[in-house]
């Protein structure tokens, strides 16, 4: 979970109220945070957040904004945001080339002026940058941020691509290096170049005079890519692979700089093709949608009889605007710096926090039950021990993923897959119907580790099933992957035989027609003429979709069918 360091005196000064340590500890519960360390000899404290969905809190300005709103009920206002119906005046442009759009498509920025950047501001911005990129940005893969002194930049800025021989002086060095050299020798290149390892061209940010700003998401340039104490005019840009995550990250930084006293000047990004928010987007940009909430659902969840007005006042403490047109429902307007409302349950949680956890009296359970492991759980644990004994490493994945990974890269149809109605990001669009895509994704980022690779997971998958009450069916599956240039159908066939031998289960094989496998090198597993799963050598086409260069064999079987 993210941890941030803040100066206690600056935080309280920004809140506008002197709080004791006990009072501060108590009120931080509202932000799902706790003080994990008081530094002796200085004014710093370290705060740990128990939620990764609130990047707006990962700085003293964002945290102070939330506490101030909670204590005094004043909704913050940011007039510099554009909306679909109200576009702000822009003070610079970012021009995106088709080539850059195909690699790392989204880039947005803004200018900030009017304050002298002091040491504490710079420390706060660098810390926010690190937390945004590492936690929310998935180690820069989804989102990365760059900060510059705009005094050295001539607009418009161009977001283009270059080959691996392109040379510039990267931040932290005093000599020119090629992109290839940066990737292999620069500390940041060693750490982050793998994000772009499947591309032959690389993103580059240039100003109007072709001066290099950065090689995103890896490293800024030495000349104008370093922010220093004393800088007054700033240019902030965020690149990413997810549109809403990139926009939100930029919004968070813009709100923080505004709260520090900077004037925020919007910048327009011009894309080579349409995006869900248009071909031209002036940022910071408010893109969040209102969410409808049922009053009955709230009261049923709490066992209460709150009025709509009560609920709106509770939400206001969290910075959330709400209005109602009907007595039985109301609508929330997310703050510009938040995008974590997927379902009305998320709003109900905010009402609970705004009202105060102490206002709800705990009740002891009225029923008594005895618990024990289910049959499928006992069976799964037995198989897990067998897999570990055969040299496999266990993996644990999310049940949600992207259409790209689950469907497109696997070269299958989406007919049986369950899609999420209101996905927060593109990475959570579908419920997985197979574990194999997750295993292949892990293998795609493991090429630097010694072979052979042997990984497995026992987990749940879900598919459409019109015969069930809710139209879906959830199964417990085992899947494993073996990767090495020496592995073939014979090796995985031997492992499958060993697994079923130790389970004392007889089975039959027949050739599989799945496009996942090389023709003639895949087999379905049958017991009593019922297909339990399949295994085989993965097709080179699918391996190339995941960027895997080493032969892989996979197996996936339905454990529920084995039991029943």
Curated annotation (Swiss-Prot):
Hydrolase found in the keyword field: no
One annotated GO biological process: phenylalanyl-tRNA aminoacylation
Major place of residence: cytoplasm
Catalytic activity: tRNA(Phe) + L-phenylalanine + ATP = L-phenylalanyl-tRNA(Phe) + AMP + diphosphate + H(+)
Entry keyword set: Aminoacyl-tRNA synthetase, ATP-binding, Cytoplasm, Ligase, Magnesium, Metal-binding, Nucleotide-binding, Protein biosynthesis
EC number of this enzyme: 6.1.1.20
Superkingdom classification of source: Bacteria
GO cellular component, one term: phenylalanine-tRNA ligase complex
Binding site for Mg(2+): 340, 346, 349-350
Localization: Cytoplasm
SUPFAM superfamilies: Class II aaRS and biotin synthetases (SSF55681), Putative DNA-binding domain (SSF46955)
Cofactors named for this entry: Mg(2+)
Domain named B5: residues: 286-362
GO molecular function, one term: RNA binding
Record flagged with keyword Magnesium: yes
Quaternary state and interactors: Tetramer of two alpha and two beta subunits.
Stated family: Belongs to the phenylalanyl-tRNA synthetase beta subunit family. Type 2 subfamily.
Protein name: Phenylalanine--tRNA ligase beta subunit
């Amino acid at each position: 979970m993210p941890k941030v360091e803040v100066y206690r005196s600056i935080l309280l000064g920004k809140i506008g109220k002197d709080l004791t340590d006990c009072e501060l500890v108590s009120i931080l519960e509202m932000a799902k945070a706790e003080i994990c360390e008081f530094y002796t000899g200085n004014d710093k404290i370290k705060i740990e957040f128990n939620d990764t969905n609130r990047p707006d809190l990962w700085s003293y300005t964002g945290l102070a904004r939330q506490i101030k709103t909670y204590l005094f009920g004043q909704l913050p206002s940011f007039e510099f945001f554009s909306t679909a119906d109200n576009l702000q005046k822009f003070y610079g442009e970012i021009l995106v080339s088709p080539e850059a759009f195909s690699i790392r498509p989204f880039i947005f920025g803004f200018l900030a002026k009017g304050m002298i950047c002091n040491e504490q501001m710079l420390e706060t911005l660098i810390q926010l940058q690190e937390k945004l990129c590492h936690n929310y940005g998935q180690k820069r893969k989804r989102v990365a941020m760059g900060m510059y002194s705009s005094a050295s930049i001539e607009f418009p800025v161009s977001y283009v691509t270059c080959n691996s021989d392109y040379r510039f002086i990267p931040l932290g060095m005093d000599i020119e290096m090629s992109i290839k050299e940066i990737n292999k020798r620069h500390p940041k290149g060693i750490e982050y170049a793998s994000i772009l390892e499947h591309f032959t061209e690389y993103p580059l940010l240039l100003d109007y005079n072709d001066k290099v700003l950065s090689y995103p998401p890896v490293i800024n340039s030495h000349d104008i890519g370093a922010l220093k104490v004393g800088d007054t005019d700033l240019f902030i840009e965020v690149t990413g692979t997810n549109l809403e995550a990139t926009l939100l990250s930029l919004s968070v930084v813009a709100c923080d700089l505004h709260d520090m006293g900077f004037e925020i000047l919007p910048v327009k990004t011009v894309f080579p093709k349409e995006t869900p928010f248009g071909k031209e987007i002036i940022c910071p940009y408010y893109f969040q949608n209102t969410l409808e909430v049922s009053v009955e659902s709230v009261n049923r969840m709490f066992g209460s009889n709150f009025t709509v007005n009560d609920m709106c006042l509770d939400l206001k403490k969290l910075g959330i605007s709400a209005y109602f047109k009907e007595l039985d429902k109301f609508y929330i307007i997310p703050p510009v710096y938040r995008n974590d409302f997927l379902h009305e349950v998320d709003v109900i949680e905010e009402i609970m926090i705004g009202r105060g956890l102490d206002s709800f009296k705990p009740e002891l359970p009225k029923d008594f039950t005895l618990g024990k492991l289910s049959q499928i759980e006992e069976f799964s644990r037995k198989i897990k021990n067998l897999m570990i004994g055969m040299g496999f490493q266990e993996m644990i994945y999310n049940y949600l993923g992207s259409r790209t990974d689950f469907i497109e890269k696997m070269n299958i149809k989406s007919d049986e897959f369950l899609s999420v109605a209101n996905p927060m990001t593109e990475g959570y669009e579908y419920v997985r119907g197979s574990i194999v895509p997750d295993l292949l994704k892990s293998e795609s980022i493991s090429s630097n580790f010694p072979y052979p690779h042997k990984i497995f997971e026992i987990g749940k998958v879900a598919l459409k099933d019109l015969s069930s009450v809710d139209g879906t069916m959830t199964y417990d599956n085992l899947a494993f992957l073996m990767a090495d240039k020496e592995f073939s159908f014979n090796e995985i066939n031997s492992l499958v035989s060993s697994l079923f031998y130790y389970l004392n289960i007889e089975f039959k094989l027949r050739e599989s027609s799945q496009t996942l496998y090389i023709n003639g090198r895949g087999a379905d597993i049958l017991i009593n003429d019922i297909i339990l799963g399949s295994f085989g050598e993965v097709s080179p086409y699918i391996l190339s979709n995941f960027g895997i260069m080493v032969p892989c064999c996979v197996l996936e079987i339905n454990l529920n069918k084995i039991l029943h």
